């Protein structure tokens, strides 16, 4: 079994860069309602450890993540990896070996910078109070090749340093992820 998995899973230490593209992303901004945005950018993960439960897998650390969108209302909206070490490691779990099938669960902490916030002033920086969870439970290959990940629940966004003052919510984030070696 381990020999079969050996070819399926990336080795510890490997860094995997991917492009990200998410269209028609609904961002609820309290005073404006829902703004629809198209994000593009990238994410990079590093394989940190093996998972021994079930059929096995690996734990992944997000080491770079940034996507941005242009909005006529909000200007440039940028989602960037937050500079914190408390984000859980992401998971790549083997669901079956013949044929290969995987579930990837991505845990993300980030800031959202809105260039032209409603009400004026300089850029507004928001952060998520709890990690965003993106899942694809139907991967047939890893790294992903044009695979779509879905946000598991809406993400509340509040000003950095004021996590209870929610002013926006990321409602969905259907993101297509493609390995970009």
Give the ranges of each region predicted by the language model:
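Extracytosolic secretory-pathway proteins
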Residues: 1-181
């Amino acid at each position: 079994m381990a020999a079969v998995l050996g070819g399926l899973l990336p080795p510890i230490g490997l860094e995997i860069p991917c492009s990200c593209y998410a269209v028609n992303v609904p961002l609820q901004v309290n005073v404006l309602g829902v703004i629809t945005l198209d994000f593009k950018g990238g994410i990079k993960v590093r394989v940190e450890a093996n998972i021994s439960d079930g059929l096995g897998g690996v734990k992944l650390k997000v080491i770079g993540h940034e996507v941005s969108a242009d909005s006529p209302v909000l200007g440039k909206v940028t989602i960037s990896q937050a500079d914190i070490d408390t984000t859980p490691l992401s998971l790549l779990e083997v669901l079956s070996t013949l044929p290969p099938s995987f579930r990837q669960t991505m845990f993300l902490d980030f800031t959202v910078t809105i260039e032209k916030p409603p009400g004026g002033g300089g850029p507004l920086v928001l952060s998520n109070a709890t990690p965003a969870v993106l899942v694809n439970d139907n991967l047939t290959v890893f790294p992903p090749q044009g695979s779509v990940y879905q946000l598991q629940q809406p993400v509340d966004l509040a000003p950095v340093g004021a996590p209870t003052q929610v002013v926006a919510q990321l409602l969905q984030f259907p993101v297509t992820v493609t390995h970009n070696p």
